């Protein structure tokens, strides 16, 4: 925005995968709360929107897919502890967007989740919560995909499928 000061909020689409999806979701909530601007859309690719990756997690995908894959529940716990400045931070919806009680006024949202990903269920639950709050939301689970599949490049069928969803979403279909 600094190099394009004439950019209008309706031209902004936030996009992020994994922790980047966390940042995009948190920024959308913060933008609404501050009233400074609101992006038109957000695209969250296998987003990390929660703060609990223990065995007690509300989301079964943490237990089902939290071992023996690239992203494990143990790594997620480590990342959470590195990211949080304090235990209190972990309770903030700017840290874990799914904790936000009021999800009204959020941008149009596309959420893509991976079938074999500890983050799958929280991403899908976040989409349901956004929809229940009256937002326009699409959620698609990429079958047989692992967390991080976007790094495989455009030759990957999972990436191609994702780009189809993204293009349709951006075109407003």
Whereabouts are the PLM-identified features?
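Alpha/beta-hydrolase superfamily serine-hydrolase fold, recognizing
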Residues: 1-173
